[in-house]
């Protein structure tokens, strides 16, 4: 098994709408020793507006936004080529810090919008993990595992910059992609060194299939969770093997063994439904596709409240839960009802194409066309747009052409796309994406807030930076005002 540790810097925090600005990644061998590294940056396409805050965090100035050697499309192509090359010889685990909910989502959606297979991390034998999950589990078992500091709420700070700095690593250029990648490797390397017997256990759940296999084969185990600023251990038992997944989200459901399961079994269906609303919850969710940490039951048995209960009783409860198919069916039926009720209250607005990655896979025909489309020259790319079965793919292809080769677009098509971009970025409504007005408000607030210095050394330095990116967005606004 090899590892690719990686990090992205983007122009926004919303994964449906952000764009990759920079990537850093390091290939490591099975012993977690570096083999190769890669870093690249691209220009921001001018059909979208960045957030001022994101650019301040990763110090992306106007020159970096506009003068990098690579276009956005070229960078996405390079990332795909590199990831495929590095993982071609043997299965590879992709690891980012807090990556499951951000970096992985961004790369999936960027690939989706670039007419590529979005699931490069967890297909063809590859799997993905999250360094933050490992760090949280390591602290749950040993709060002294790494040097750390407390945050404003008095909890251990799990921020990568903080952990790297306090454990002797260079963190002064944090929020540049390669530095964050290096420090992810450094922090994980320390944990591997200090908890060698746990390292493989931390990483074994990098695939959904492995997690589901554990649910079917084991009666009880320790799971780690993080909430209210603390890592916690729970001793849990999975539901019956025939029905242990959430019926909608497909995440495993387990029962906290501090609860008397026989009392739960005795509840009527309506009583059970009410019980599932109570806190603390007897039912816990294991997000099977998000690299949960699952460990031997002995770890949770050492902590309160499980250490006050007879181990034989805990094992008996686990066996009863695992073998009660009716209870599992009732729980899953209630979860189904709850999910349907929630869906009825959600917005009925049609989603934008950028928000639809999880509404369906590309057809075999469109997947075949993806490769041909990327190999074609710009004029042939234009001619191929109407061959896609899925309108989303034609839409994304046209946006790539608008940004990369606008001169080959028919005038009517160019004007139509430009009007659509203008409607978005010049909107004065509250939108899901960043508008020009959103940017100006953000920029003005940052000018006035002396507490938000990011990594700028002086206020004058910050103001000069903000003036530069403000000019960039003003020019963008002028470009689209006549659309």
Regions found by a protein language model. Name each.
Residues 1-112, 157, 167, 265-400, ...:
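Conserved non-catalytic scaffold segment of RNase H-like nuclease domains
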Residues 10-12, 100, 133, 183, ...:
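Short, glycine/acidic-enriched loop or turn micro-motifs at the edges of active sites
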Residues 32, 114-121:
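Short helix-capping segments at alpha-helix termini
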Residues 42-58, 62-65, 126-179:
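Active-site-proximal helix-loop-helix substrate-binding element of RNase H-like nuclease domains
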Residues 93-100, 105-106, 144-209:
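Acidic, Mg2+-coordinating catalytic module of metal-dependent nucleases/exonucleases
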Residues 109-117, 190-193:
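Short, surface-exposed basic-aromatic patches at helix termini and helix-loop junctions that form
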Residues 118-131, 192-219:
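Mixed-charge, glycine-rich, non-catalytic linkers/tails in nucleic-acid processing enzymes
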Residues 204-286:
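Acidic catalytic cores of enzymes that act on phosphate-bearing nucleotides/polynucleotides
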């Amino acid at each position: 098994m090899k590892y690719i540790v990686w990090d992205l810097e983007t122009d926004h925090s919303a994964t449906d709408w952000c764009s990759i600005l920079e990537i850093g990644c390091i290939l490591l061998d099975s012993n977690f020793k570096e083999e190769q590294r890669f870093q690249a940056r691209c220009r921001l396409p001018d059909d979208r507006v960045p957030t001022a805050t994101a650019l301040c965090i990763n110090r992306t100035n106007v020159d970096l936004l506009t003068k990098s050697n690579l276009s956005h499309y070229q960078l996405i192509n390079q990332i795909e080529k590199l990831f495929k090359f590095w993982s071609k010889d043997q299965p590879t685990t992709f690891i980012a810090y807090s990556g499951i909910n951000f970096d992985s989502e961004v790369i999936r959606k960027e690939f989706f919008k670039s007419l590529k297979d979005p699931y490069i991390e967890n297909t063809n034998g590859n799997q993905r993990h999250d360094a933050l999950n490992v760090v949280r589990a390591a602290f749950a078992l040993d709060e002294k595992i790494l040097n750390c500091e407390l945050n404003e709420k008095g909890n251990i700070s799990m921020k990568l910059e903080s952990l790297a700095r306090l454990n002797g690593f260079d963190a002064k250029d944090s929020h540049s992609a390669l530095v964050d990648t290096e420090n992810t490797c450094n922090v994980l390397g320390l944990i591997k060194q200090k908890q060698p017997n746990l390292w493989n256990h931390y990483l074994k759940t990098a695939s959904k299939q492995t997690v589901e296999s554990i649910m079917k084969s084991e009666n009880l185990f320790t799971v780690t969770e993080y909430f209210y600023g603390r890592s916690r251990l729970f001793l849990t038992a999975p539901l019956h093997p025939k029905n242990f997944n959430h019926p909608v989200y497909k995440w495993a459901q387990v029962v906290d063994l501090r609860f008397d399961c026989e009392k739960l079994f005795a509840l009527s269906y309506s009583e059970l439904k009410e019980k599932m609303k109570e806190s603390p919850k007897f039912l816990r969710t294991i997000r099977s596709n998000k690299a949960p940490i699952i460990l031997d039951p002995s770890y949770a048995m050492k902590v309160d409240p499980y250490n006050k209960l007879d181990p034989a009783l805990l094992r008996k409860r686990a066996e009863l839960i695992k073998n009660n198919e009716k209870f599992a069916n009732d729980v899953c039926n209630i979860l189904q009802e709850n999910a349907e009720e929630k869906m009825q209250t959600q917005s009925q607005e049609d989603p934008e194409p950028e928000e639809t990655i999880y509404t369906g896979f590309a057809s075999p025909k469109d997947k075949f066309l993806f490769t041909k489309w990327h190999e074609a020259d710009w004029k042939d790319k234009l001619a191929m747009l109407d061959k896609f079965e899925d309108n989303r793919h034609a839409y994304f292809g046209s946006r790539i052409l608008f940004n990369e080769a606008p001169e080959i677009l028919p005038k009517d098509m160019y004007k139509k796309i430009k009007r659509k971009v203008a409607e978005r970025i010049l909107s004065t409504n509250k939108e899901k994406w960043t508008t020009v007005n959103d940017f100006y408000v953000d920029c003005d607030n940052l000018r006035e807030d002396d507490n938000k210095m990011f990594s700028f050394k002086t206020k004058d330095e910050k103001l000069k930076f903000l003036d530069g990116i403000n000019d960039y967005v003003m020019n963008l606004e002028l470009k689209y005002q006549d659309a």
